[in-house]
Amino acid sequence: VVICVIVPVHNTPKPWLADAVNSIRRQTYPHWHLLLVNDGSTEVGTREFLDNLNDPKITKIQLTRSVGISIATQTGVDAAHGDFIALMDHDDMLAPDALKKVAEIIQRHQSDVIYTDETTFSDRTQEKRDGYLGLPHLKPAYSPDLLLSHNYITHLLVIRKEMIQRAGGFRAEFDGAQDYDLLLRVAEQTDKIFHLSEPLYHWRQSVQSTSLDTGAKPLAHLRGQKALSEALERRKIPGEVLTANAPHFFRVRRKVLGRPSVEIIIPFRDQPLMLRQCIDALMSNTRYDGFRVLGVDNGSVEALTLELKDHYERETDQVRFISLDVPFNFSQIVNFGVQHAKGDHVVLMNNDIEVINVDWLEAMLEHSQRPEIGAVGAKLYYPDDTIQHAGIAIGIGDYAGHPHKHVEGGYPGYLNRLHNIQNVSAVTGAMMMIKRDVYDAAGGFDEQLFKIACNDVDFCLRLRSKGLLNLFTPYAQAYHHESVSRGYEDTPEKQVRFQGEVEAFRKRHAEA
């Protein structure tokens, strides 16, 4: 596989350009070619360096005047001989084995797009909080929804040349967001997009470079927004592109199509005050009116609980109750609720949830309605306003865990992740929306192996194995008074049962 590295050059300080070029020359992979496109540089040092550079593996293209990064890059793409194009900035560096590892992935997976992790580094012209070698950008596996929130892929990006040309190449009107615009178009041509999880790209951040201060690029933000809006039009997605919490971050807000019905299923046993808090919050904090509440009573005995049920059934036809008198088996109770639900979509909700924002239901429904989506999860807070749930990752804790658990509620999270709609491995069953027919087709929660623990994560991984994407949205928010409802795994019997379920989970999902 020949990989052609394209570097548009414009008035680059000579030592930085030397760093970039030498990092390519030091590659352990032999089948590379470097194309330097001089975009009308006027700096003497830059021109001198290029004039003195003689290497059969390096081609120099001289543009008489500056045409901007998109046209300069596309000029390189058009002249490239390789099957694959690697995009690199003129002041950055590649790790010595970067291209070797990329080539291995291409051969192993027949990928069309490969992206790697990266580190930032400072040129010491100013004190960076995180020192000389800065924050590593460790990225997730390909996440179509995170890509609609921002360009999380950035560097190193390697794309099959044929894909770039098929997508229409780089477009000058998107200078500053040209990679993002191209990526969105390429992602419509292929899903063979592979994440190589090693930091093989070193991104220079300096006073002279605008990459340190994202606020210095308002045009880049607007062009990114325009690229996204055009992507929605091409994909025929009714919706709008809003700015999220920071520059270069977006929220694609999709239109809810029609008025689908939603049934919110709440399993409970007594604890009437908590149940009342949960249902009252739903009734007063939900703007969408096409929902009903179905309480599944698992053996309540308190008089106050029975009075509360009577009260709701008298006062509103939006709330009804059914009973299932069996020993506590969360999966069985939830499945029983879904069997009796009448909605197009169901929301599984613990009785210790208290919804916060009035548009929480639309924020989940806009994604649950999509044919490619499995389960949709919400942003849940502990009562002290720290994060309880923002998606579930496999492999942390005993079997799976919550990244960002207990961090301050307003904190943006790692690389702003707490403010972005994104695909995740799993979401919690404490507040999960899913299409009713998808729930049934997947066979619901597993009542045999996962009576109490692991059932939501197991369910999500089964959805994923059917090719569906699970999704976290920060735009549906609720308090979760966690495990107040049934207590923690705090007795020897509970511990034994929990360990058994974890073992069964690890066996079934060894590949995950």
Enumerate the language-model features and the residues they cover.
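Short, acidic, metal-binding catalytic loop of nucleotide-sugar glycosyltransferases
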Residues: 22-31, 280-290
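A conserved acidic beta->alpha catalytic loop
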Residues: 30, 38-47, 65, 297-308, ...
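Short aromatic/hydrophobic "clamp" motif used to bind/position activated sugar donors
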Residues: 85, 346
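Conserved donor NDP-sugar-binding/catalytic core segment of glycosyltransferases
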Residues: 97-132, 353-398
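A short, conserved alpha-helix in the catalytic core of glycosyltransferases
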Residues: 163-166, 173-199, 228, 360-364, ...
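Glycine-rich, basic loop-to-helix element that forms the pyrophosphate-binding segment
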Residues: 63-80, 324-341
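A recurrent flexible, glycine/aromatic-enriched loop bordering the glycosyltransferase active site
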Residues: 70, 78, 133-158, 162, ...
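C-terminal, non-catalytic tails of nucleotide-sugar-dependent glycosyltransferases
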Residues: 1, 216-259, 374, 384, ...
